[in-house]
From Swiss-Prot:
It comes from the Bacteria. The glycine cleavage system is composed of four proteins: P, T, L and H. In this organism, the P 'protein' is a heterodimer of two subunits. One of its GO terms (molecular function) is glycine dehydrogenase (decarboxylating) activity. It holds the Pfam family GDC-P. It is an enzyme of class 1 (oxidoreductase). Signal peptide: none annotated. Keywords: Oxidoreductase. Its EC number is 1.4.4.2. SUPFAM superfamilies: PLP-dependent transferases. It comes from Macrococcus caseolyticus (strain JCSC5402). This is Probable glycine dehydrogenase (decarboxylating) subunit 1. InterPro entries: GcvPA (IPR023010), GDC-P_N (IPR049315), GDC_P (IPR020581), PyrdxlP-dep_Trfase (IPR015424), PyrdxlP-dep_Trfase_major (IPR015421), PyrdxlP-dep_Trfase_small (IPR015422). It catalyses: N(6)-[(R)-lipoyl]-L-lysyl-[glycine-cleavage complex H protein] + glycine + H(+) = N(6)-[(R)-S(8)-aminomethyldihydrolipoyl]-L-lysyl-[glycine-cleavage complex H protein] + CO2. The glycine cleavage system catalyzes the degradation of glycine. The P protein binds the alpha-amino group of glycine through its pyridoxal phosphate cofactor; CO(2) is released and the remaining methylamine moiety is then transferred to the lipoamide cofactor of the H protein.
Length: 447
């Protein structure tokens, strides 16, 4: 019997088995030891028609807590930002609706130009010479930057601040383990990197120094001083940065960063749990040929018309295989398009205004919480800051959910020393009323 959605009949199965020379499905898996194979039938419910199935799925979806149902003060790498309506309209067009970067430029000029614009805007925001077409997310961008540094310097020691997002550091450790690289983590002092410890750790074997700006605790690192520590050494200076903050903050390129990486989720990509993000990777011209991922370049055809092509492809794994700069090639072209459309819709003034509202609203919330007697950790911050509570953050967040709020990130999940510490994010979407109500609620729960 054929199935509406699984068109594999018994006749189809028989024909396929005859083609590969087996008599049963079990023979197909004979290399798997029988003792570890599942025996019997799977406990799968009977199939449903479309209407009751949709009803069941909707009931499951309604259990989710989202920024549409609750007011969110959660950040830590994924943020609730304004997304211009035009973003979904553009990325839903069939011409664009793919994550794949095109190999045939003559039929893909629109998509190639969109990627080129993404690269251009990222390079401008970061103050760097060039940027690639995108990476999987901020974590892979961060780890790939370390791999580039190790390959370029031929050193194997990676120095990374513990003020970098812990998930990015976890990805870095995964990359480093397989290549027998040494990762040295530098402690945090007063919500920023311990500069004395960082300076002492740098030696002739160091491939790179890696920090985040603004860092995981929301604080602004002293990039100028950190860059000075690498002068006279082979070590590259790598900065992971929230690109929206660079509409307001001095870009890392102006401090002499060699590589700037991060996550473009803040531009046009909804906050979700485990869904696709869009990493970015920017570099100096000196390191351009060692960058991972696709690069779109501008050129002219034989009639003198402007055109766009995938360029410097000899770096990539589909040509050089084991000698490629990275295994990353096609990845997040669709989300890069979303980020491009969002940045274009906002414009320079809009990105500045968005970043400024984040800063001002976060500062308002910080000052109000200090006035109310909360212990707010000191530091110059952007749109996130740390508050120490009298009770476990998990308990406070559970109570906040019942009141219609998504609380901040529980830093106790990162390190025990941050037990009862909450990382609070304030974006341009939060109103004064929401901020004041949140403070009142946590004041009661913290008593």
């Amino acid at each position: 019997m054929s199935h509406r959605y699984i068109p594999l009949t018994e006749t189809d199965k028989k024909e396929m088995m005859e083609t590969i020379g087996i008599n049963s499905i079990d023979e197909l898996f004979q290399d798997i030891p029988e003792k570890v194979r599942f025996q019997g039938d799977l406990n799968i419910k009977p199939r449903k028609s479309e209407t009751p199935l949709l009803r069941e799925l909707q009931a499951l979806a309604n259990k989710n807590v989202t920024s549409d149902t609750h007011v969110s003060f959660l950040g830590a790498g994924v943020y609730d930002h304004y997304i211009p309506t035009v973003v979904d309209h553009v990325i839903s067009r069939s011409e664009f609706y793919t994550a794949y970067t095109p190999y045939q430029p003559e039929i893909s000029q629109g998509e190639l130009q969109a990627i080129f614009e993404f690269q251009t805007m990222i390079a401008e925001l970061t103050g760097m010479d060039c940027a690639n077409s995108s990476m999987y997310d901020g974590g892979t961008s961060f780890a790939e930057a370390a791999m580039l540094a190790c390959g370029h310097t031929r050193n194997k020691k990676i120095i990374v601040s513990k003020a970098v997002n812990d998930q990015s550091r976890a990805v870095l450790h995964t990359y480093a383990k397989g290549q027998h690289l040494e990762v040295v983590e530098i402690d945090v002092k007063d919500t920023v990197t311990d500069l004395d410890a960082l300076k002492a750790a740098i030696d002739e074997d160091t491939a790179c120094v890696m920090v985040q700006y603004p860092n995981f605790f929301g604080s602004i690192e002293d990039l100028e001083t950190i860059k000075s520590f690498t002068e006279g050494t082979k070590a590259l200076f790598v900065v992971s940065s929230n690109p929206m903050s660079l509409g307001l903050l001095t870009p890392p390129g102006e401090f002499g960063a060699d590589l700037v990486v991060g996550d473009a989720q803040v531009f046009g990509i909804p906050a979700q749990l485990g869904g696709p993000h869009c990493g970015y990777f920017a570099a100096t011209k000196k390191l351009m040929r060692k960058m991972p991922g696709r690069l779109v370049g501008q050129t002219q055809d034989d009639e003198g018309n402007r055109g766009f092509v995938l360029t410097l492809q000899a770096r990539e794994q589909h040509i050089r295989r084991d000698k490629a700069t990275s295994n990353i090639c096609s990845n997040q072209a669709l989300n890069a398009l979303a980020a491009s459309v969002a940045m274009s819709a906002l414009g320079k003034n809009g990105v500045y205004e968005m970043a400024n509202q984040n800063l001002q609203k976060a500062n308002y919330m910080k000052s109000r919480m200090v006035e109310e007697g909360f212990e707010v950790l000191e530091g110059t911050t952007f749109n996130e800051f740390v508050v120490k509570f009298n009770h476990p953050v998990k308990e406070i967040n559970e109570k906040l959910l019942d009141e219609g709020f998504i609380g901040g990130y529980d830093l106790g999940q990162v390190e025990e020393q941050y037990h009862n510490h909450m990382l609070i994010a304030v974006t341009e979407l939060r109103t004064k009323e929401e901020i004041d109500t949140f403070i009142a609620k946590v004041g009661v729960f913290n008593a």
